[in-house]
Amino acid sequence: MILTGKEIQKRIGNDIVITPYSEKQLNPNSYNLRLHEELLVYTELPLDMKKPNPAEKLVIPESGLLLKPGILYLGRTLESTETHNLVPMLEGRSSIGRLGMLVHVTAGFGDVGFKGFWTLEISVIQPLIVYPGVEVCQIFYHTLEGQITEYTSGKYQANRGIQTSMLYKDFEK
């Protein structure tokens, strides 16, 4: 089952933590998250799954930044979230999709117990000017059945910003 907006509001501070939180971003069954001003772009192609891939930082000015097709931009939400006893999921807003912007490639699924900023895997299918602070995605919550084991991986937990892929750590096992 997906939580309603009223149920999300009721669980804020308990099962759900969103920082900063504004009731204005609450929807009937989700909560809008905003785009932070920083982006990362990989600087060496091809990317290699077995090693860390270098990236450079871009800052989205108030006047906007032109995103181009064929480039993966890593961004993050302005809000950090923490979820217990629920499964958080992230999707792009339909208004953003109608402009040809995707906010994630495959990472729209969060684990129970995840806390931190959501790294966004941004791409555009046509040139698009983006702005910092725009509500680009929405988080919604599923209930669980069965015994709950919270996410404890050190790879992405309690992040402090945008994270490039750490898949290379899987090869070190």
From Swiss-Prot:
Record keywords: Hydrolase, Nucleotide metabolism, Nucleotide-binding
Gene3D superfamilies in UniProt: 2.70.40.10
Catalytically driven reaction(s): dCTP + 2 H2O = dUMP + NH4(+) + diphosphate
Pfam families, per database record: DCD
E.C. number: 3.5.4.30
Any one of the GO BP annotations: nucleobase-containing small molecule interconversion
UniProt binding sites for dCTP: 93-98, 111, 119-121, 138
Pathway(s) served: Pyrimidine metabolism; dUMP biosynthesis; dUMP from dCTP: step 1/1
Annotated site (Important for bifunctional activity): 108-109
One GO molecular-function entry: nucleotide binding
UniProt key word Hydrolase: yes
Catalytic machinery residues: 121 (proton donor/acceptor)
Enzyme class: hydrolase
Protein task: Bifunctional enzyme that catalyzes both the deamination of dCTP to dUTP and the hydrolysis of dUTP to dUMP without releasing the toxic dUTP intermediate.
Similarity section: Belongs to the dCTP deaminase family.
Oligomer and partners: Homotrimer.
Protein name, UniProt field: dCTP deaminase, dUMP-forming
Gene source species: Leptospira interrogans serogroup Icterohaemorrhagiae serovar Lai (strain 56601)
